[in-house]
């Protein structure tokens, strides 16, 4: 895997291994950093929700229903075995893809993130909401999924020991599309979002609040469904999902984004951004998938990089 740090401007130096190192020069493309509150600093002290210290009662792992925006909605919540009511923990929303469901998220360990949480003994509450309340996996013409997300988040904060400064969202395909949509509207609630093959069309998009948010994204160079570029004229495609957050996080001159040309994927982190609000993009030669492995590796690097990204905070 090639992991690049893109600096604007930069002086590149090639090592004998062919890895691009760089020395940073003053960056005229970066905005003056806004003040960052304590809850957004890296490795900040957890911010406990109102549910911290409360007994779980009958609110336990499993399938739940609630009424939201006039619709009966369902979700599955997974409260970890090492949950401690007095210690606020991370909360991760996993949004399913077309053809999938909330149960799919449970079956695939919430895009593999639960496997890493258990391995590292990190208590994480996982939530898999159910879409399919209209003709699409997630709603394309109104904000009812956004209201559903807000209602769930409010409920979980009231019932559970949630670290309100470490709420995350991830998804693949249509799940990435709704995750991206939420990333434009819930920057004050979401610490970071991970999108695997996102698209910024055929989905409800709110007016972007243009607030900073940590963002990780992947797109295959041969993806014909959620294309890296669907339309330059309309700024549609995974490329523009990345560029939107680069700009919202502080860069005024948008960079060229390196794309993979060999079977080994290329991950780029864009410099000139506050460390609290990184933007990272993983490119690979391949199609529409959330599972990708480099030659000779049995590790799904998308899941691994997502976990590492979320754990920065």
Positions of the model-derived regions?
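Bacterial N-terminal signal peptides that target proteins for export
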Residues: 1-8
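Bacterial N-terminal signal peptides
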Residues: 8-18
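A domain-start/cap signature at the N-terminus of enzymes
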Residues: 20-91, 141, 170-194, 198-200, ...
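Active-site machinery of serine-nucleophile hydrolases
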Residues: 91, 95-158, 261-284
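Solvent-exposed loop/turn segments at secondary-structure junctions
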Residues: 97-101, 131-136, 173-177, 198-202, ...
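Alpha/beta-hydrolase fold nucleophile elbow
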Residues: 161-173
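The feature captures the conserved acid-bearing segment of alpha/beta-hydrolase catalytic domains
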Residues: 191-282, 286-289
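Catalytic active-site module of serine/aspartate enzymes centered on a nucleophile-bearing elbow/loop
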Residues: 298-313
């Amino acid at each position: 895997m090639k992991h690049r740090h893109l600096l604007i401007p930069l002086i590149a130096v090639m090592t004998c291994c062919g890895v691009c190192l760089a020395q940073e020069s003053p960056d005229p493309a970066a905005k003056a950093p806004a003040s960052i509150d304590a809850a957004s600093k890296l490795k900040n002290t957890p911010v406990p929700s109102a549910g911290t210290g409360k007994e779980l009662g009958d609110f336990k792992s499993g399938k739940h229903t609630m009424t939201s925006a006039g619709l009966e909605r369902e979700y599955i919540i997974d409260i970890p075995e090492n949950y401690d009511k007095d210690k606020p923990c991370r909360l991760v929303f996993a949004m399913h893809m077309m053809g999938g469901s909330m149960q799919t998220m449970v079956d695939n360990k919430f895009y593999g993130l639960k496997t890493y949480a258990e391995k590292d003994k990190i208590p994480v509450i996982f939530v898999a909401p159910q879409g399919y309340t209209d003709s699409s996996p997630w709603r394309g013409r109104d904000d009812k999924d956004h209201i559903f997300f807000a209602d769930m988040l409010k409920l979980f904060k009231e019932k559970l020991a949630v670290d309100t400064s470490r709420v995350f969202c991830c998804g693949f395909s249509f799940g990435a599309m709704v995750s991206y949509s939420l990333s434009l509207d819930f920057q004050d609630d979401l610490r970071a979002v991970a999108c695997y093959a996102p698209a910024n069309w055929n989905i409800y998009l709110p007016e972007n609040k243009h607030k900073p948010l940590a963002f990780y994204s992947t797109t295959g160079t041969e993806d014909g469904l959620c294309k890296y570029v669907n339309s330059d004229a309309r700024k549609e495609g995974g490329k523009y999902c990345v560029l939107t957050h680069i700009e919202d996080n502080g860069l005024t001159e948008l960079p060229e984004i390196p794309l993979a040309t060999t079977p080994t994927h290329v991950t780029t982190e864009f410099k000139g951004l506050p460390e609290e609000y990184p933007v990272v993009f993983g490119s690979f030669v391949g199609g529409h998938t959330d599972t990708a492995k480099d030659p000779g590796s049995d590790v799904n690097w998308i899941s691994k990089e997502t976990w590492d990204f979320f754990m920065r905070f």
